[in-house]
């Protein structure tokens, strides 16, 4: 599955997958106490009697738009969200994180806003920020870069291994684009097809943090998939069974981006299309899980799991897309 528009914007997803596969093979030679290695949402290692999950991630080129608009704080929240949302996808309760901020030049207000965002996100996720690193590297960085590394404690692993045909697929609404697809968005802005001034508030909305709702139903679900880079293809990490999804009408910002010049099919390969996290749950528990989650926002009954393989998506335009 090659995202051609994303590739033209400078992000070759196929190359990235090749890098991931190569790196995974090389680093596997270090595994001794590793329970889940590279390739899932988070790595898990056994330390004493504890299963510790660890994940590192950044916010990508959303930082460029943050700097252009001077709307900085949301990317601090994004950085927390991108990490803790991946930790919960292996069954972990996030507990702590450290941050890394790299600057092209000293930018006092930018650093303050980033840290304010990280702290706000950390409080929402109930994690402690226990340190970090700040660097000024004018020969390396353009603007600023931001990443976090988070750890969590796993009581019971959630890898998707228990998913079976007949299970339901639920989706929790996203707050917007979250932190993926921004190289493509920036390309549209640079080409004059999308107005940054008009849509800056939508484009800079922070990623929704799903820790509280997912922890509430963790013992009732079979798996969770954070919809980030690669969009719905990420569901293949959890199961090889066939997944059929009937996607809801997405928020207007996605339609605006599509109208600006992104192919309809491409939208579902790059963006979350209004769904931030996907859950797999048995038929017996589906209604109870859905009811518990409705206090945290809109919950969609997206589809089911079947015998077979691959992912079939019915888009909001009633077109059929196979991943």
Curated annotation (Swiss-Prot):
Disulfide bonds: none annotated. The lineage of its organism: Archaea, Thermoproteota, Thermoprotei, Sulfolobales, Sulfolobaceae. Pathway: Purine metabolism; IMP biosynthesis via de novo pathway; 5-amino-1-(5-phospho-D-ribosyl)imidazole from N(2)-formyl-N(1)-(5-phospho-D-ribosyl)glycinamide: step 2/2. SUPFAM superfamilies: PurM C-terminal domain-like, PurM N-terminal domain-like. It is an enzyme of class 6 (ligase). The keyword Nucleotide-binding applies. Belongs to the AIR synthase family. It holds the Pfam family AIRS_C. This is Phosphoribosylformylglycinamidine cyclo-ligase. It is found in: Cytoplasm. Its EC number is 6.3.3.1. GO terms for cellular component: cytosol. Keywords: ATP-binding, Cytoplasm, Ligase, Nucleotide-binding, Purine biosynthesis.
């Amino acid at each position: 599955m090659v995202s051609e528009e994303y590739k033209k914007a400078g992000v070759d997803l196929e190359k990235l997958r090749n890098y991931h596969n190569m790196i995974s093979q090389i680093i596997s030679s270090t595994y001794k106490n590793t329970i889940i290695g590279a390739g899932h949402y988070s790595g898990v290692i056994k330390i004493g009697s504890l299963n510790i999950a660890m994940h590192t991630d950044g916010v990508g080129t959303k930082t460029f738009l943050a700097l252009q608009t001077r709307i900085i704080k949301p990317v601090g929240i994004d950085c927390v969200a991108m990490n803790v949302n991946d930790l919960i996808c292996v069954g972990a309760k996030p507990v702590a994180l450290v941050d890394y901020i790299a600057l092209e030049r000293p930018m006092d207000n930018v650093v303050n806003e980033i840290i304010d965002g990280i702290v706000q996100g950390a409080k929402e996720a109930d994690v402690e920020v226990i340190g970090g690193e700040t660097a000024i590297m004018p020969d390396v960085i353009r603007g600023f870069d931001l990443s976090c590394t988070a750890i969590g404690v796993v009581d019971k692993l959630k890898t998707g291994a228990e998913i079976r045909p007949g299970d339901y697929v639920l989706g929790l609404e996203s707050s917007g684009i979250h932190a993926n697809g921004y190289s493509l968005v920036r390309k549209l802005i640079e080409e004059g097809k999308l107005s940054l001034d008009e849509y800056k508030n939508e484009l800079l909305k922070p990623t929704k943090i799903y820790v509280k709702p997912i922890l509430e139903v963790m013992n009732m679900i079979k798996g969770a998939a954070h919809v980030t880079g690669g969009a719905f293809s990420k569901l293949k990490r959890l199961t090889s069974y066939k997944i059929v999804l009937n996607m809801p009408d997405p928020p207007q910002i996605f339609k605006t981006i599509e109208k600006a010049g992104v192919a309809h099919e491409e939208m579902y390969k790059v963006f979350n299309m209004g769904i931030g996290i996907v859950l797999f749950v048995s038929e017996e528990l589906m209604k109870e899980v859905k009811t518990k989650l409705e206090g945290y926002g809109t919950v969609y009954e997206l589809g089911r799991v079947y015998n077979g393989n691959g992912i079939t998506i019915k888009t909001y335009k009633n077109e059929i897309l196979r991943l």
